[in-house]
């Protein structure tokens, strides 16, 4: 008898990839407007920032932190990294959280597991803070028995 099932969160229980792309576009629009930049200037700085953060930190949880990408983007643009990095970060996550939807059949599967006393775990990357926010926003926190994040 199955006792436990473990799921990834992003691109398993909900579709993350498209939201991520749109979230980055939201950051771009916000940053370009605030700093009078062209989109290509933003994307050049942002892509370099993401690459640099991953090279500097390796594959650990901090290397996924969008606030670091935003801060480094501003540094790459020779702007004060404290000027709007937090606002950029909030633009991104507000968009993601406001637009997430469970994939078809996920709620029914989680309900089935609970009804049949199957423990549910989440094993995922990104920071624990944002993963908790996502789980609550998706309304599935009542189903989850354990979470492991990177």
PLM feature spans:
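Hydrophobic alpha-helical core bundles mediating ligand binding, dimerization, or RNAP-core interactions
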Residues: 23-28, 46-50, 70, 89-93, ...
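A metal-dependent, Asp-based hydrolase signature
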Residues: 48-90
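Short, acidic loop-to-helix structural element flanking the phosphoryl-transfer center
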Residues: 63-68, 81-84, 90-120
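Substrate-recognition "cap/lid" segment bordering the active-site pocket of phosphatases
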Residues: 98-101, 121, 126-150
């Amino acid at each position: 008898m199955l006792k436990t099932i473990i799921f990834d969160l992003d691109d398993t229980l909900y579709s993350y990839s498209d939201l991520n792309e749109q979230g980055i576009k939201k950051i771009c629009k916000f940053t370009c407007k605030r700093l009078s930049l062209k989109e290509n200037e933003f994307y050049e700085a942002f892509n370099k920032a993401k690459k640099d953060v991953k090279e500097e930190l390796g594959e650990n949880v901090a290397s996924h932190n969008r606030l670091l990408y935003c801060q480094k983007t501003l540094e790459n643009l020779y702007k004060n990294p404290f000027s709007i990095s937090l606002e950029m970060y909030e633009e991104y996550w507000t968009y993601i959280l406001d637009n997430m939807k469970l994939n078809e059949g996920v709620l029914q599967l989680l309900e089935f597991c609970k009804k049949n006393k199957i423990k549910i775990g989440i094993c995922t990357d990104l920071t624990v803070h944002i993963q908790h926010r996502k789980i609550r926003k998706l309304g599935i926190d009542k189903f989850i028995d354990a979470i492991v994040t990177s």
